[in-house]
Amino acid sequence: MINPNPKRSDEPVFWGLFGAGGMWGAIIAPVIVLLVGIMLPLGLFPGDALSFERVLTFTQSFIGRVFLFLMIVLPLWCGLHRMHHAMHDLKIHVPAGKWVFYGLAAILTVVTAIGVITL
């Protein structure tokens, strides 16, 4: 018999943030690491293109703040979601694990938002 009042799951929201963070970490983050961490220090990228003044101007614009926010928050949600499910897979049952991991991700998201807004 089909339950006429099925319980709604909050898991799709967390899976969505996990998927978005995974895609961001796989596509966008390596490009930024390549540019800022490898090409710029080795002189393979024009230094004035990523000068302090230009980067500061970009990060203080709306699109720059959104980019910086997403660069921090999406991989954060992905990582904490992975940790939550890794604990479950290893049979290490954290009391209220969903609240611990997703709550920490939510708190760090708010902290990041405050930091990016006040930048």
UniProtKB/Swiss-Prot annotation:
> Where is it located?
Cell inner membrane
What is the topology of this protein in the membrane according to its UniProt annotation? Multi-pass membrane protein
- Any single biological process term in GO: fumarate metabolic process
Query: Keyword annotations for this protein?
Result: Cell inner membrane, Cell membrane, Membrane, Transmembrane, Transmembrane helix
Can you cite an annotated GO cellular component? Answer: plasma membrane
Q: A GO molecular function for this record?
A: succinate dehydrogenase activity
Keyword Membrane carried by entry = yes
| Protein name per UniProt | Fumarate reductase subunit D
Q: Which organism is it from?
A: Salmonella paratyphi A (strain AKU_12601)
Which lineage do the record's taxonomy fields give for this organism?
A: Bacteria, Pseudomonadati, Pseudomonadota, Gammaproteobacteria, Enterobacterales
